[in-house]
Amino acid sequence: MNTNKVAIFGKKGSIAKYDLTDNKPIWVGELPKGQMPHVIAQYENYILVFSWAWFGSKMVHCFREDSGDSLWSHYQQTLHSSMIPFLPHTFENHMYYLASSKEVAKLSWETGDIVFRKRFKKSIFNEYGLGIISNDVILLSKKDALIVNKETGDVKPYPELSKKLNLKEITAALGNGISFMSLISLTHPQEGDGGAGATAAGGGDGGS
């Protein structure tokens, strides 16, 4: 078993998986010119990097944790509105998340392909959160529950859940496929915010 101390660090233009014991990089992943990593997170063998450039665009990148291979990059606005946190939930190697207050999205971890980013009808007084219960992708509010078709993104009422739970009393929920990714509620802080405290580092075998 490898007992070397390993962590992933980021600086302007790149991230690196670094062996602190042997004092050498294991791999270096390049970011687009001018992009500065601000938040680094891991889900299984995937590393997500949230970056920004001075007076420029914010981006999301995905790397393979074991090799450092770059899998994909997207501009933030392609994935989600800046007005809503990026809170992905995983089912069968895909992320499901709210791309805006009235859009649900599905994204492949492996390829970065956006399977759908689809609007659904909602009242301006109704705010939804997304969760995965068993095999179902659910949108939950204080008033009702909706179920999302995982292939098309179509949304329809899910009255069965409303009958079993008093939705008005629910303030938080934990379903499947969240891991610590649900904690990334502030994926693109302002440029003046602190940096080091926003970095997630793996230990030993790289956090896996």
Residue ranges of each PLM-predicted region?
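Secretory-pathway ectodomains
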Residues: 1-208
